[in-house]
Swiss-Prot record:
Cellular-component GO terms for this entry: lysosomal membrane
Known role: Essential for the degradation of glycogen in lysosomes. Has highest activity on alpha-1,4-linked glycosidic linkages, but can also hydrolyze alpha-1,6-linked glucans.
Catalytic residues (UniProt): D518 (nucleophile), E521
Pfam families assigned to the protein according to its UniProt record, in alphabetical order: Gal_mutarotas_2 (PF13802), Glyco_hydro_31_2nd (PF01055), Glyco_hydro_31_3rd (PF21365), Trefoil (PF00088)
Any GO BP annotation: lysosome organization
Residues that hold substrate according to the record: D404, R600, D616, H674
Maturation propeptide residues: 28-69
SUPFAM superfamilies per UniProt: (Trans)glycosidases, Galactose mutarotase-like, Glycosyl hydrolase domain, Trefoil
This protein's name: Lysosomal alpha-glucosidase
Region: Disordered, residue numbers: 47-80
Coiled-coil positions: none
Domain P-type, first and last residues per copy: 80-131
Length: 952
């Protein structure tokens, strides 16, 4: 730990010079401090998501009393202090457009930027902080059991009301790779996010980081011990801590930043004056807009392939501003500053360390990984059942049938209409008899318009006091699908019990299997409430982030409404998460098996309880392509069960688009085709025979790969791994992978290169160093009950030095490659996972040049709770070496004991084998292709018993 003292003033320059001659080390600190105030500039950036508001605008208002009063006696910035490189200027007018006079009154520099207006927004700020702008001072720094504590004091108020002039800093060195610090008001308790996080009681003995402090202006500098690289430097701009405006800025080690979801953007965010707003909102995915979820975590790549992450545990409305220096500023409207830094150093380690804090993903039931089908407009059980029958007749796998609002009585939760859905329970039981499952939409808003005694969920909720209330302590009433509605407060323990009861009572009528929780930002068709919102500081804060609609009440409920734990102002971004937790627990209680919840609104830690779909996407090629970075993004955030609506939800799809989307969707961790109310049909059987054949081929491939996908989810659940992952996660030292976001990996082994443009019969993808085998050379369909597609000639392997490769991609093909060095389990595909799980299995073995490969299979009954705690699972490792394949039985029980291994396909066998043995018994009917270097070995073995297969 080092403390950096402030640079000398001009008045003391001569004295400081003499002191510096005697204290060279101190001068070194000063010079380094001054250098870090202006981070080095890096050129190049990706397109802008959304730019910050201009600091100058014609017709801006004159300085108001707040500005004048706040800055009495403050010296103005002098020209030499304003000589700051444009890309390193931090905005002194984040709250509004201001004039030169207003900027001067704030003690800031005013230099109009050269670029002109872009609509209503601009790039670099015109009004910006000088390096001498007053900030907090570090005092009383001392060691603690966990790290350090200190007091931060400010003598000059800012231009925001209710500055907190004295703060407490706590720095906790929690683990070797995790640093945690908080900045709080020591005199008054402020809202903190009620997220369960690890509790550590002693400091890490050998951290991978060092911590330094700047005394005045206060700042925290975090370095990587290995190379001294600065990962966090908060001295680049003043710290703000007012009641409703908190700002913390830091330099960034590179421009390669990902995270800060949920937004429609490339995987790597632009650092070209990009504003990212976090305030959950019901809005069809639109560039530059705040969407359904808020995840204040970013992962930054560094030169050489190391990475680190930063998590601000804060649920208030906020902006995050990225600028080209590169640097980042957090701007929150409340709470505290609760910051975690994750040292990695590998990107996948950063993800795991983040999940150590927010929670590892839940383990989904096996059936949840099958194909799901839904549309708004299945208006009766007869129509819904006919869809299932059509899928079966056309030989399309289908595991889960869904219904949208159509099933409800007057669009009210926990009801079904007695017209089109009078035999609703019987339909669900019939699905179960066919080995399928059923899910339906459940919105959080509860109808409040009926007479007393007419609607039990509202009557009972009112009796138990479970609803969010207004300033008169009455339930806040908004409008959603059923009309006037109240909103459950899922932070209230009474609401959790009430929700469990409502779910259980409805499940007693209709034995559904999972819950689709929608509209839970929460969405509201009117602004605030039927009675409007109060005129107070929560509804009209001094700083409003760049939310669509311009106010915090837009498309949701009043910010000042009351919940059990705090105001909605503080808890809004947690609404979807708290409903997901309630629904997760309610399903466990009602069904006694593993819950399956898909939610639209999310927050950090969501993956511990539920999955996510990316909302109301358009049926367009642009949104097909943008779904790839979004799926990757949510995996990095610990929400691996994620997918976009296959073929799109808004607008009509086309046959080609739907084929390509089905091919990509076959590699979403969560795959659902969902259609809007008035659109043309987009069920797979609705298209031409060639299109159906292409879709069937993609679905068949997914079902064959389900044992591997399930194993990946197990690894995510127990070890914080990702399921779908960006290439840079596996190949961080190859900088060519860093911006690849139109391909994805499943785990370490499978590389998927989809076609994302219209009219294309080939596709170009990046292949990192290694051998990549075409998965289509592995025969899988013969294992199952579905008809095999016609074979097509393929290039069996790509030997890459790290290069872009153009691949043939006719309409019936999605390119999937198996990485050398890996073994994946396969299973015969059926029309349901119930059927597939009874089919024989196979192994695809992809050898390296040295003839080695490894893999894993995790297997259980697919839906029981606590299988790990009870030991009710089978786990098998596979190893290939020296022309031999063996399995290692890590854990074996009756679950998996009957899994039959019927075929082993070895890729990359260099020479023709003369003999193949299975447990010492010759295999006479093996086949080998000298052209493709593929060895197919028919066997009759059990996965859960030791075996040895060899060739020579």
């Amino acid at each position: 730990m080092r403390v950096r003292h402030p640079p000398c003033s001009r008045r003391l320059l001569a004295i400081c010079a003499l002191v510096s001659l005697a204290t060279a080390a101190l001068l070194g600190h000063i010079l380094l401090h001054d250098f870090l105030l202006v981070p080095r500039e890096l050129s190049g950036s990706s397109p802008v998501l959304e730019e910050t508001h201009p600091a100058h605008q014609q017709g801006a208002s004159r300085p108001g009393p707040r500005d004048a009063q706040a800055h009495l006696g403050r010296p103005r910035a002098v020209p030499t202090q304003c000589d700051v490189p444009p890309n390193s200027r931090f905005d002194c007018a984040p709250d509004k457009a201001i004039t030169r006079e207003q900027c001067d009154a704030r003690g800031c520099c005013y230099i109009p930027a050269k670029q002109g207006l872009r609509g209503a927004q601009m790039g670099q700020p015109w009004c910006f902080f000088p390096p001498s702008y007053p900030s907090y001072k570090l005092e009383n720094l001392s060691s603690s059991e966990m790290g350090y504590t200190a007091t931060l004091t400010r003598t000059t108020p800012t231009f925001f009301p209710k500055d907190i002039l004295t703060l407490r800093l706590d720095v906790m060195m929690e683990t070797e790779n995790r640093l945690h610090f908080t900045i709080k008001d020591p005199a008054n308790r402020r809202y903190e996010v009620p997220l369960e996080t690890p509790r550590v009681h002693s400091r890490a003995p050998s951290p991978l980081y060092s911590v330094e402090f700047s005394e005045e202006p206060f700042g925290v500098i975090v370095r990587r011990q290995l190379d001294g690289r600065v990962l966090l430097n908060t001295t680049v701009a003043p710290l703000f801590f007012a009641d409703q405006f908190l700002q913390l800025s830091t330099s960034l080690p590179s421009q390669y930043i990902t995270g800060l979801a949920e937004h429609l953007s490339p995987l790597m965010l632009s650092t070209s004056w990009t504003r990212v707003t976090l305030w959950n909102r019901d809005l069809a995915p639109t560039p530059g807009a705040n969407l359904y979820g808020s995840h204040p975590f970013y992962l930054a790549l560094e030169d050489g392939g190391s990475a680190h992450g930063v998590f601000l545990l804060n649920s208030n409305a906020m902006d995050v501003v990225l600028q080209p220096s590169p640097a980042l500023s957090w701007r929150s409207t409340g709470g505290i500053l609760d910051v975690y830094i994750f040292l990695g150093p590998e990107p996948k380690s950063v993800v795991r360390q983040y999940l150590d804090v927010v929670g590892y993903p839940f383990m989904p039931p096996y059936w949840g990984l099958g194909f799901h089908l839904c549309r708004w407009g299945y208006s009766s059980t007869a129509i819904t059942s006919q869809v299932v029958e059509n899928m079966t007749r056309a030989h399309f796998p289908l595991d889960v049938q869904w219904n949208d609002l159509d099933y409800m009585d007057a669009r009210r939760d926990f009801t079904f209409n007695k017209d089109g859905f009078r035999d609703f329970p019987a339909m669900v039981r019939e699905l179960h008899q066919g080995g399928r499952r059923y899910m339906m939409i459940v919105d959080p808003a509860i109808s409040s318009s009926g007479p007393a005694g007419s609607y039990r969920p509202y009557d009972e909720g009112l009796r138990r006091g479970v609803f969010i209330t207004n300033e008169t302590s009455q339930p806040l009433i908004g409008k959603v699908w059923p009309g006037s509605t109240a909103f459950p407060d899922f932070t209230n323990p009474a609401a959790l019990a009430w929700w469990e009861d409502m779910v259980a009572e409805f499940h007693d009528q209709v034995p559904f299997d999972g819950m689709w929780i929608d509209m839970n930002e929460p969405s509201n068709f009117i602004r605030g409430s039927e009675d409007g919102c109060p005129d107070n500081e929560l509804e009209n804060p001094p700083y409003v982030p760049g939310v669509v609609g311009g106010t915090l009440q837009a498309a949701t409920i009043c910010a000042s409404s009351h919940q059990f734990l705090s105001t909605h102002y503080n808890l809004h971004n947690l609404y979807g998460l708290t409903e997901a937790i309630a629904s997760h627990r309610a399903l466990v209680k009602a069904r006694g098996t593993r819950p399956f919840v898909i939610s639209r609104s999310t927050f950090a830690g969501h993956g511990r309880y539920a999955g996510h779909w990316t909302g109301d996407v358009w049926s367009s090629w642009e949104q097909l392509a943008s779904s790839v970075p979004e799926i990757l993004q949510f995996n990095l955030l610990g929400v691996p069960l994620v997918g976009a609506d296959v073929c799109g939800f808004l607008g009509n799809t086309s046959e080609e688009l739907c084929v390509r989307w089905t091919q990509l969707g076959a590699f979403y961790p969560f795959m659902r085709n969902h259609n809007g109310l008035l659109n043309l049909p987009q069920e797979p059987y609705s298209f031409s025979e060639p299109a159906q054949q292409a879709m069937r081929k993609a679905l068949t491939l997914r079902y064959a790969l389900l044992p591997h996908l399930y194993t990946l989810f197990h690894q995510a659940h127990v070890a914080g791994e990702t399921v779908a992952r960006p290439l840079f996660l596996e190949f961080p030292k190859d900088s060519s992978t860093w911006t690849v976001d139109h391909q994805l990996l499943w785990g370490e082994a499978l590389l998927i290169t989809p076609v994302l443009q219209a009219g294309k019969a080939e596709v170009t993808g990046y292949f990192p160093l290694g051998i990549w085998y075409d998965l289509q050379t592995v025969p899988i369909e013969a294992l199952g009950s579905l008809p095999p597609p016609p074979a097509a000639p393929r290039e069996p392997a790509i030997h890459s030095e790290g290069q872009w490769v153009t691949l043939p991609a006719p309409l019936d093909t999605i390119n999937v490659h198996l990485r050398a060095g890996y073994i994946i389990p396969l299973q015969g595909p059926g029309l349901t996972t119930t059927e597939s799980r009874q089919q024989p299995m196979a192994l695809a073995v992809a050898l390296t040049k040295g003839g080695e490969a490894r893999g894993e299979l995790f297997w259980d009954d697919g839906e029981s709770l606590e299988v790990l705690e009870r030991g009710a699972y089978t786990q098998v490792l596979f190893l290939a070496r020296n022309n031999t394949i063996v399995n290692e039985l890590v854990h074996v029980t009756s679950e998996g004991a009957g899994l039959q291994l019927q075929k082993v396909t070895v890729l990359g066998v260099a020479t023709t084998p003369q003999q193949v043995l299975s447990n010492g018994v010759p295999v006479s009917n093996f086949t080998y292709s000298p052209d493709t270097k593929v060895l197919d070995i028919p066997v009759s073995l059990l996965m859960a018993e030791q075996f040895l297969i060899s060739w020579s």
